Amino acid sequence: MIFDKDDFKAYDADLWNAIAKEEERQQNNIELIASENVVSKAVMAAQGSILTNKYAEGYPGRRYYGGTDVVDVVETLAIERAKEIFGAKFANVQPHSGSQANCAAYMSLIEPGDTVMGMDLASGGHLTHGAPVSFSGQTYNFVSYSVDPKTELLDFDAILKQAQEVKPKLIVAGASAYSQIIDFSKFREIADAVGAKLMVDMAHIAGLVAAGLHPSPVPYAHITTTTTHKTLRGPRGGLILTNDEELAKKINSAIFPGIQGGPLEHVVAAKAVSFKEVLDPAFKEYAANVIKNSKAMADVFLQDPDFRIISGGTENHLFLVDVTKVVENGKVAQNLLDEVNITLNKNSIPYESLSPFKTSGIRIGAAAITARGFGEEESRKVAELIIKTLKNSENEAVLEEVRSAVKELTDAFPLYED
């Protein structure tokens, strides 16, 4: 390392101590936030490398600055690996985030004011799928589709009927809180039927898609976007895929010079490392274990009548639980669990009656605990600890028992081996 830990600590003790406290928190907490994961040391090394010094506006072979031969190699590695993972003809690895990837995708497919259909936030969609507080809802005329009120599943007949009525230029598929398999072929059929384009945001399930454990949207979507963290287990960032050469040109222009300047080549390098990890056969085993652990936790809640799992179960890395029979709301549940070192987030549920700041539900994800080595037995234990906490929220003796059990689990599965 150019700047080792001792030098860092001596130079900026305040910042060093803050980072050390966060490392301690991550080690001693059970992380269930579905959008978080644990990256490898190789990913962190790449992201902390000397590549952070280099400015490289443009794309490999077409840069505005000199001295880019090496970063061209780095970015090309990331591009080619992304294409191999997802079977796409074109990939842009420069987006700084999933939201910026989505912004560039919209710019490549539609014009401001065009009508777009996206999943309702309470049904499991994302802010960038048309929420009024997001650039997406402010720039385009978004009309939301929802899940069926009884099954809490996507109702493709209802979505088709709605599309025929509103005649969107674009349909957005994908979710941030939907626990079932999404049939992207049906979304493409609906888009074709009404003359719309299809964009898929697979940010949450990209790792499962990469492992062949969830149907891929790439053959069906005009543009597919994703983050590179979450189930993909890479650095925080975005990725855009397409099989259409003309759209690829528009995507590249939308990213640079459209909404970004120079790419973060140290982050691109970290993406390249994580993509190499995804191509390793061990990643498929990891992804399979994520789903097993998610199901194991969900099964514990399904056996308790005081809790309700949205849509009745899970087929991916996450699930939502209605907690209102046990505690006042999801925010209360989140705060109670924080006190026993279990981290998750409050989450709206379909046809939500409470505000987004309170919510009726919590969202539970298995990606991070699986990366630490938790198996189905440990996952069931985690679910039991959540239930125990929420049902004994004023019993300090019970809460202390939970803290001790959490400590046993986190000690048994360290965040990183020394």
Curated annotation (Swiss-Prot):
Family note: Belongs to the SHMT family.
Cofactor(s), names only, from the UniProt record: pyridoxal 5'-phosphate
Superkingdom of origin organism: Bacteria
GO annotations of cellular component type: cytosol
Reaction it catalyzes: (6R)-5,10-methylene-5,6,7,8-tetrahydrofolate + glycine + H2O = (6S)-5,6,7,8-tetrahydrofolate + L-serine
Gene Ontology BP, a term: tetrahydrofolate interconversion
Molecular functions per Gene Ontology: glycine hydroxymethyltransferase activity; pyridoxal phosphate binding
Role summary: Catalyzes the reversible interconversion of serine and glycine with tetrahydrofolate (THF) serving as the one-carbon carrier. This reaction serves as the major source of one-carbon groups required for the biosynthesis of purines, thymidylate, methionine, and other important biomolecules. Also exhibits THF-independent aldolase activity toward beta-hydroxyamino acids, producing glycine and aldehydes, via a retro-aldol mechanism.
Protein name per Swiss-Prot or TrEMBL: Serine hydroxymethyltransferase
Site (Plays an important role in substrate specificity): H229
Top-level EC class: transferase
Organism classification: Bacteria, Bacillati, Bacillota, Bacilli, Lactobacillales
Pathway assigned to this chain's UniProt record: One-carbon metabolism; tetrahydrofolate interconversion; Amino-acid biosynthesis; glycine biosynthesis; glycine from L-serine: step 1/1
UniProt subunit comment: Homodimer.
PANTHER family in the cross-refs: SERINE HYDROXYMETHYLTRANSFERASE (PTHR11680), SERINE HYDROXYMETHYLTRANSFERASE 1 (PTHR11680:SF35)
Positions of post-translational N6-(pyridoxal phosphate)lysine modification: K230
Keyword Amino-acid biosynthesis: yes
